[in-house]
From Swiss-Prot:
It comes from Oryza sativa subsp. japonica. Pfam families: Glyco_tran_28_C, MGDG_synth. Involved in the synthesis of the major structural component of photosynthetic membranes. GO terms for cellular component: chloroplast membrane. It comes from the Eukaryota. CDD domains: GT28_Beta-DGS-like. This is Probable monogalactosyldiacylglycerol synthase 1, chloroplastic. The keyword Transit peptide applies. The gene is MGD1. Residues 1-109 form a transit peptide. Its EC number is 2.4.1.46. GO terms for molecular function: 1,2-diacylglycerol 3-beta-galactosyltransferase activity. PANTHER family: MONOGALACTOSYLDIACYLGLYCEROL SYNTHASE (PTHR43025), MONOGALACTOSYLDIACYLGLYCEROL SYNTHASE 1, CHLOROPLASTIC (PTHR43025:SF3). It catalyses: a 1,2-diacyl-sn-glycerol + UDP-alpha-D-galactose = a 1,2-diacyl-3-O-(beta-D-galactosyl)-sn-glycerol + UDP + H(+). The lineage of its organism: Eukaryota, Viridiplantae, Streptophyta, Embryophyta, Tracheophyta. Its main location: plastid.
Length: 535
């Protein structure tokens, strides 16, 4: 097969080029060695730019042409003018450029990764709305792909990830495909894929976790650690990222910035794929949350934004929107009596919500018993309040509490999915200092009693609640019960005031602001001149 000429290659790449340009006699084309034989359709050996990039290439070729006859020069001038007009009219085709349009999929055939939008990697192109879709190029109308990186080290990271996913679906429908992945568990080898188990062990042994948290905080400690870790897991993590072919990447975990950003930088993709961080700690947060190469860092509070600035991020990288919570918390709340009837609660007695997290941890039973005594008026022989207990996945605790003969109305639930309804049925909440639960309680206007926290990332949540007049802190079940009894009795004004303070501090629209800003980043970043094959 003879080697293709420049004009034949251009014709193959874009049949719409002016016939006059393609019929230029070979003496008018710059002298150069023969071009290599065209590769097979699945090869990424070379690429032919489309749009304005082609005009630049042709301009260089024409200017490289030396002296010729006057007639030939005149003809070349006319042909070039015609071609320039063509470029102005037809050369501005653009398409989203992310992993998919860069041809970085790991599937065979060049039609895409085979997962989500973009087809199943069948190779070759097709005609779409009269435009030729060339191999390796994502369809302009295909959904953009969002990849959320998280880890199940505590429930807050997954909850934030699912909230962002739900908001994307609610706001943009089929325009986006959203994938949530535990990057370390799913895409790294042992022992790195044991991160959730290691975290669970450490937080159960407080001194060990405290030493780990504060010992890795200095940059001179964690940066070399990430650099060394990248040596062992970069290949696997890169494959994990390419599997999803994202157009934008969101990290909701402090350990999901450094290694992925090193990979994107090594592949030259930092300017093409926005990488963003959504910080899910309300006040104190580990320094690994902040990386100077992120496109955007979404902070839940002014305190966190100050830490981001101190870590070296620019003000243009930082947005203070609040903590993302499930979109269902933004919907209008149903009447309290209706919610209480559905939950089997008394319609008139004030209610306290006692939570133990997803695993039902903490002094739940002791606190529930203390509340049962404090909310019963021995003189009148009647209850002054009621209790709704959420035990999570702790079935033994659920069974024990359900077997108790209570003097006050008590409803015991296991793992619940509609927390907004449970909160809407109650007047205050007792919980550990998890940021997600605090943010949700504030949206519902519930005064908060914090009964514990994890050293490090949750320590700052206690003053965040107390100093803003939204609640109190105590580890004593008896003292907690007394606070609730006072709120339901002689100190009801304090309960109302704290409810108002919580509503003032709440940011119910945070998740929607985040996804709309992400949408704008994708719109700005991913539209570049289209290429016919992998970059």
């Amino acid at each position: 097969m003879p080697a293709p000429t420049a004009s034949s290659l251009a014709a193959a790449a874009d049949p719409a080029l002016p016939a006059a340009f393609l019929s230029l006699p070979s003496p008018l084309l710059p002298a150069s060695p023969p071009l290599p034989a065209a590769p097979a359709p699945s090869s990424n050996a070379f690429c032919v730019p489309r749009g304005p990039a082609r005009a630049v290439a042709v301009s260089v070729s024409v200017s490289a042409y030396g002296a010729g006859s006057t007639a030939a020069a005149s003809r070349l001038h006319r042909m070039w003018a015609e071609f320039s007009r063509f470029v102005r009219l037809h050369g501005n085709q653009i398409a989203p450029l992310g992993f998919a349009s860069l041809g970085l999929g790991v599937g065979g055939g060049g039609g895409g990764s085979g997962e989500g939008a973009g087809g199943g990697g069948g190779g070759g192109g097709g005609e779409v709305d009269g435009l030729v879709e060339e191999e390796g190029v994502a369809r302009a109308e295909a959904p953009k792909k969002v990849l959320i990186l998280m880890s199940d080290t505590g429930g807050g990271h997954r909850a934030s990830a699912e909230a962002i996913k739900a908001a994307f679906i609610q706001e943009f429908g089929d325009d986006y495909q959203v994938f949530v992945t535990d990057l370390w568990t799913d895409h790294t080898p042992w022992p790195f894929n044991q991160l959730p188990r290691s975290y669970s062990f450490l937080v159960k042994h407080g001194p060990l976790w405290k030493m780990t948290y504060y010992g890795t905080a200095p940059r001179v400690v964690h940066q070399p650690h990430f650099a060394a870790t990248s040596t062992f897991i970069a290949r696997e993590v890169a494959k994990g990222l390419m599997k999803y072919q994202p157009d934008v990447i969101i990290s909701v975990h402090p350990l999901m910035q450094h290694v992925p950003l090193r990979i994107l930088r090594s592949k030259g993709l930092l300017d093409k794929i926005p990488f963003t961080t959504v910080v899910t700690d309300l006040s104190t947060c580990h320094p690994t949350w902040f990386h100077k190469l992120v496109t955007r860092c979404y902070c839940p509070s002014a305190e966190v934004s100050k830490r981001a600035l101190k870590a070296g991020l620019q003000p243009s990288q930082i947005k203070v929107y609040g903590l993302p919570v499930r979109p269902s918390f933004v919907k209008p709340i149903r009447p309290e009596d209706e919610l209480r009837r559905e939950l089997g609660m008394d319609e008139y007695l004030p209610a306290v919500l006692l939570m133990g997290g997803g695993e039902g941890m903490g002094p739940i039973e002791a606190t529930a018993r203390a509340l049962g005594d404090a909310l019963y008026d021995e003189v009148l022989g009647e209850p002054t309040g009621q209790i709704l207990v959420i035990c999570g996945r702790n079935k033994k605790l659920t069974s024990r509490l359900q077997s108790i003969n209570w003097k006050v109305p008590v409803q015991v639930k296991g793992f619940v999915t509609k927390m907004e309804e449970c909160m809407g049925a109650c007047d205050c909440i007792i919980t550990k200092a998890g940021p997600g639960t605090i943010a949700e309680a504030m949206i519902r206007g519930l005064p908060i009693i914090l009964n514990g926290y994890i050293a490090g990332q949750e320590a700052g949540n206690v003053p965040y609640v107390v100093d803003n007049g939204c609640g109190k802190f105590s580890k004593s079940p008896e003292q907690i019960a007394k606070i609730v009894a006072d709120w339901f009795g002689p100190r009801s004004d304090e309960l109302k005031m704290m409810s108002q303070n919580a509503l003032k501090l709440a940011r119910p629209d945070a998740v929607f602001k985040i996804v709309h800003d992400l949408h704008e980043l994708v719109r700005q970043k991913c539209f570049v001149p289209q290429y016919a094959c992998a970059s």
